[in-house]
Amino acid sequence: MAVRIRLKRMGAKKKPFYRIVVADSRSPRDGRFIETIGTYNPITEPAEIKIDEELALKWLQNGAKPSDTVRNLLSKQGILEKFHNLKYGK
């Protein structure tokens, strides 16, 4: 089972709001997911990003691959750098 960390679209038409979820890569974008690890609201200025750092690091260590957008969000929050330091022992 290939696990991805990706965005699940919520909100109304023309007003997107996203949940950052861990899901099987074969499930639909807004379909079944394993766990919610955060939220992303691109409408606010500046964009509001809330991610549970412990859960994100746990899933990254277990081999979950982030989507391109989620990878950018994780790096903005400094989580990818912490994961890199944990993985390579710096």
UniProtKB/Swiss-Prot annotation:
GO terms, molecular function: structural constituent of ribosome
One Pfam family, short name: Ribosomal_S16
GO biological process: translation
Record-annotated disulphide pairs: none
A cellular component term, taken from the record's GO annotations: small ribosomal subunit
Keywords for this protein: Ribonucleoprotein, Ribosomal protein
Superkingdom of origin organism: Bacteria
HAMAP family the record matches: Ribosomal_bS16
Family: Belongs to the bacterial ribosomal protein bS16 family.
Protein name: Small ribosomal subunit protein bS16
